[in-house]
Amino acid sequence: NDEGHMAKNQWVSAENEISYDSPDSPDGGSWLYFGKDGKIVTAKWMSINGKTYYFDEDGLMQTGLLELDGQTYYLGEEDDGARKTGWILLETITKDTDDEDIWCYFDTEGRLIVNQMDRKIDNGYYTFIDGKMQTGWVLMPSKSDVTDSNAASPRITDYQYYGAAGDGKRAEGFRSIEGLSGIHAADEVYTFYFKAGKPYVSDKKGNSLFTINAKKYAFSDLGIMQTGRQIANVANDEIANFYFGEDGIVKTGKQTIYNEETGETENWFFHTDGDKKGQGYHGLRDGILYVYGKRQDATADQRYAPADL
């Protein structure tokens, strides 16, 4: 330095040779660091007062994004230099306003997570593509290598859901959200149920039954939770009538259902237990005839009316 003393464990400005004794750290400009042997630290990582810095071959402290040995690191802004870990908003790194709500994650060694599916971070799972945390409906990488020219129609089973912008946590349980472009109607909100990010989807055309927390629900082949009176697939490749509440839970026993097509209120009965629980009752019950769940009533001027069983 100017006084002729050997600099040890000191930051020194590359521009004006101002020196700082540790534990002070640099504040703007280009900085060098002299180790305990009085030599400039070059081409290596250096831990200084609990923070990690990287110095290039000329000994200059690096800032911003650093590409090194096939890995990407973030060393803060020009007045910082300390290696970062954890969540970093991409806009902070690039200064690009188009990167709003896009997050990156740097592991405990400061390495950017580039392409990884369902990485566990704290209490959630996240997917990263090209270093960016994914949100919303995400086509899984194993499915996305099919080119547009030979790709079949998109299927909801090729996707997982990762929360809204700024969230990114893999979905679990019920979510009322917009559907998938090209699969569902635009701007419509539907209710789905997710397990490990994947929606419950009927594996047959139409609706199929699923048990969630000991309750029965029906989901379509597009993954949509069903409400009201619906037809669903049952065992032996058969179908049956069911009635679901607004919460999607199957209803049993006597039910009064409004028929929007006829404008009339109808009386139905659905099995209350057993393997057929929830299915429309077919046959005589307490002297009343039900056909696939719907009560059959003769008109006011009839004592008897034909019914097909």
Language-model region placement:
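Extracellular adhesion/carbohydrate-binding repeat motifs centered on closely spaced tryptophans
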Residues: 1-309
